[in-house]
Structures are given as structure tokens and as C-alpha cells.
Amino acid sequence: MKVLVIGASGMAGSAIVKSALAAGDQVTANGRSQEKLADLQKSFPEIDILAKDAFALTKEELLNFDVVVDAFSAPTKSYLQIDLAAHLVHLVREEQSPRLAFVLGAGSLHTGSDQHLVVDDLAKAPNAESWIEIPESQLYELEYLRHVKNVSWFGLSPSQEFVAGDADPEPLVGQETLLVNAEGKSFTTSGTLANALVAEYHHPEHLNQRFTVANH
């Protein structure tokens, strides 16, 4: 499959590039920094690179791909995650392809006996005001996507902690609830998330839905 990875040089994006190549996909890595993409290409010489602001991507460019992965991150301007999702959706409205894949956050998952949102717990953490907009924006991004009916998309949320690391060969998989392993830990490695995302677009199970994975 022909796959475009937006935000390819980041932790999630680079792991997705690796997993997609392992699955036999033809991968194009997108980002604004030519230097970062060139470094990524040193690790994965078989990729193509497209150094360009994601907001400048055109419909014609997206239609060249079977899958477009949004692994974009903008910690200081997290609202851009919502804007980019809307931009990508706008470009492929009423098209059968590409399928849009969004890396979301854990804040939109539910937890506890009352099934409250994880973001509500995060908001109570010390100094949360300095970073809470990030999980809030990821929640709003998912809420927006849930109203999108004429575009093929799916979202994938990691668990409470999202860390760099290899894939778990036997990950936990869920839908709307925060996953916790047998040791009481809730974390997802970048490799686990990447493998789950690539598996989903090769073997679709979550059509216009979000799901979640965690290391067991």
C-alpha cells in the first residue's frame, strides 16, 4: 500500500514508518524539516520524503495514497491538531480513498466506576494548566471526527503513558475504556501503537471509529 505519514520524524511517526515498511508498504514521510526527514531517510533509505507544511498538502497529493497517517504534534499550539484533521477531511470529502488514520490521545478514553474521561483526571494534576490543552485538543479532535460520515477514517489512542519502545507481540486492545495491564500499569510503547495502526489499515476492523491499545 502507498502510505503518507504526516509528522514522520516524531516518536509516533517514525515508529509508524518502521512498521509500515516492515509490512511491505511504500512509505512517504512528511514533515516541515528537510533535515529531520533526511535523518529519518538515513535510518530507512527506502522511504520517499516530502518536506512540506502539512497544511499545504493538496487533494491531488493525498489522492496518490491509499492511507494518510496523521501523527502530527504541535505541543505549543495543540489546536492545530484539530485544524489539521479538518483540513485533511476537507481534502478527501466523498472520496473512497485514501483512508485517514489519526494518532489521538488517552484523554478521550473513559476510566473509573463512573466512566469519566481521563482528561478530567489529568486536569487535576499539578501545573496542569501548562499542558492540559494538549489532551483537551485531542479530545476535541475525536469529537469532530465522530461527525465525519463521508470520509473513511479511524483513530488510535495510546494508554495513559505513551513512551518510546518496541512493540508488544500480545498487546491489549480496547475501544473506549483506558486499558490497564495485570500489573496495574497503563502504558503503550510507540512500537505497539505503530503495529496496531498498520494492522488496522491492512485489515480494517474499526471503520470511522477510535480504538486503543496498550502493552500487556
Segments (PLM) and residue ranges:
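Conserved Rossmann-fold NAD(P)-dependent oxidoreductase catalytic core, especially the SDR/UDP-sugar
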Residues: 87-133
